């Protein structure tokens, strides 16, 4: 609110009442009284000014207490840090040994599980793959590829790996038991330290929230640098609130004066101003004595005002009346902000006290650790490391063996598919050979018949004229050609096998007959006849393997 209202009232003006025309343009008495009532109501803000004085006093006391307690906490903290750093560095090292070993062991076990699952899957495929009956002697029971595999090596490998895993698990269990015992001894200290850290972090967070420079560490002591600035802010708010209250008092005085200078307003002014507040003190400064000033204003004789002075006073009053509510709101906002700042100051003081109490509690608990078996905990960690290094090599060797076995068995599956494809290829070649033979025989027979007919025609037409001894072969039939199958020997690089007696006894011209769902030729070679679906499945598996090759 401006100070123009105080200059709007002139004590040297002549006593002139407003003319009737002017009275129509000036506000009515009821309007001025409403402004006076509102101005009186705004003076209740003096309670906020009183509260502001209390807040400043409480904040100053909290600052003094915080400084003393913070100094004590800092002294204890310097000794506490070294002891805690040593204690928890040992615990951290032991825990890292356990975590590192557990992580490495878990990784190795995962690799073992993957390799073992892959091997078992391959073995299951061997069990599920039935050897086609055409590959085996007639009358033999059905067999799978797994029947041709000796799993004793797999069982022995599993036994070796299980022994290494059990020994590692036992060493790890001993280390975990040792760490739990260590944790039991540290539990009381951890509880006290947890309270200490919680108090420190809370104090640091409050300090960071009220300060423009955040704390560098959650475990650092709370800074008190923001409290003096907050105290200064409270003092400035209290001073400004007192100034705002003075402006409200001046506005109230102006309203009283305006009502009194309005016809019929004197009695109303005395009735309204009968119970106003008294003096207020702000930071050692005595504020306006509202009651005495108002009584003096009410009881003082009216100074005469000219029409222009009265109009100017009313204009200032109306303008200030529009701003009075804003002034009251500003006082309320400032006292609200002061309450918030005081809460922060007291919270920081309480945080400093809680950190101090937590620090002394940690020191008391540290004394119980004098007989801690630190050497035993460290020795247990070293023992686990030694065992793990020994068994790690053993497990890695077993992992390589599992991979080799899986490669071997997977190669068996692949070779069986190759066998199916090879049989299909041989049957295709056999069919092509037979076709060539049939075509050749047909052509040879045709040539033979043509030759016989031609010779007979020649004999009939010319034979009577030729002497029989002119050429002995004139009356002979043409030669005949026959194909004979010869049993194949072993491929190069394969040792010679004794000849198959049954095949040797077979007649050269004997027709092919079915043996064990296959074809046996005059050469004794049996080529199984496989179902088309079986061959197609083998081709699909072969193509799938080729797609997965790098």
Swiss-Prot record:
The gene is atg17. InterPro entries: Atg17, ATG17-like_dom. One of its GO terms (cellular component) is Atg1/ULK1 kinase complex. Keywords: Autophagy, Coiled coil, Cytoplasm, Membrane. This is Autophagy-related protein 17. Pfam families: ATG17_like (PF04108). Autophagy-specific protein that functions in response to autophagy-inducing signals as a scaffold to recruit other ATG proteins to organize pre-autophagosomal structure (PAS) formation. Modulates the timing and magnitude of the autophagy response, such as the size of the sequestering vesicles. Plays particularly a role in pexophagy and nucleophagy. It is found in: Cytoplasm; Preautophagosomal structure membrane. Residues 1-25, 204-224, 492-527 are annotated as: Disordered. Residues 495-507 have a biased composition (Low complexity). It is a peripheral membrane protein. Belongs to the ATG17 family. The lineage of its organism: Eukaryota, Fungi, Dikarya, Ascomycota, Pezizomycotina. GO terms for molecular function: molecular adaptor activity; protein kinase activator activity. Residues 317-350, 427-457 form a coiled coil. GO terms for biological process: autophagosome assembly; autophagy of mitochondrion; piecemeal microautophagy of the nucleus. It comes from the Eukaryota.
